[in-house]
Amino acid sequence: MVKIGVCGPVGSGKTALIEALTRHMSKDYDMAVITNDIYTKEDAEFMCKNSVMPRDRIIGVETGGCPHTAIREDASMNLEAVEEMHGRFPNLELLLIESGGDNLSATFNPELADFTIFVIDVAEGDKIPRKGGPGITRSDLLVINKIDLAPYVGADLKVMERDSKKMRGEKPFIFTNIRAKEGLDDVIAWIKRNALLED
């Protein structure tokens, strides 16, 4: 089972990305989802209502505190959810774990996630990639979402591209508009090639 952690700031499009991935990949792969919220199970409920995934393949973890603590320093609640999900579905191939909304320093405990996708959106401004932080510099894949909003918020995608290359070196990044499925195929291709080790 490959575990992919998806993290990023509130509203960046983490849940939308996970929903889109399950919609396009669950027919070919045995998948499940774990979501994290501080005080609610709102993201899990959204997934249950909008995803093609059956309800028993989605677990919502209510962290009750700092979102990055639940995925890094004390990942015990999430590790229990992973164990529970693996018990339900022993042949699970791909488990997507969504962090609660967090800042640019969010990273997953290596026991919890084999790969990390960090999601930002252009509405935060084109300076976000150059601000760095472990989410930007260390994630296996950086997704820059909501590119359709760039003209409305004064974000320059060329600046974001330049700064992402500078901050990430050889590590990949993908521009997306998840709602319109733009860039989604590239994210799926990255998962298949890097996480699932397909050609």
Swiss-Prot record:
Highest taxon in the source lineage: Bacteria
GO CC terms in record: cytoplasm
Molecular-function annotations in GO: GTP binding; GTPase activity; nickel cation binding
Key word Cytoplasm present: yes
Binding positions (GTP): G8, P9, V10, G11, S12, G13, K14, T15
Gene3D superfamilies with a match to the protein in the record: P-loop containing nucleotide triphosphate hydrolases
Biological process per Gene Ontology, one example term: urea catabolic process
Keywords annotated in UniProt: Chaperone, Cytoplasm, GTP-binding, Nickel insertion, Nucleotide-binding
Subcellular locations according to the entry: Cytoplasm
Pfam families: cobW
Classification via InterPro entries: CobW/HypB/UreG_nucleotide-bd, P-loop_NTPase, UreG
Predominant place of localization: cytoplasm
Chain's role: Facilitates the functional incorporation of the urease nickel metallocenter. This process requires GTP hydrolysis, probably effectuated by UreG.
Similarity field: Belongs to the SIMIBI class G3E GTPase family. UreG subfamily.
Subunit record text: Homodimer. UreH, UreF and UreG form a complex that acts as a GTP-hydrolysis-dependent molecular chaperone, activating the urease apoprotein by helping to assemble the nickel containing metallocenter of UreC. The UreE protein probably delivers the nickel.
The protein, known as: Urease accessory protein UreG
Source organism phylogeny: Bacteria, Pseudomonadati, Campylobacterota, Epsilonproteobacteria, Campylobacterales
Gene: ureG
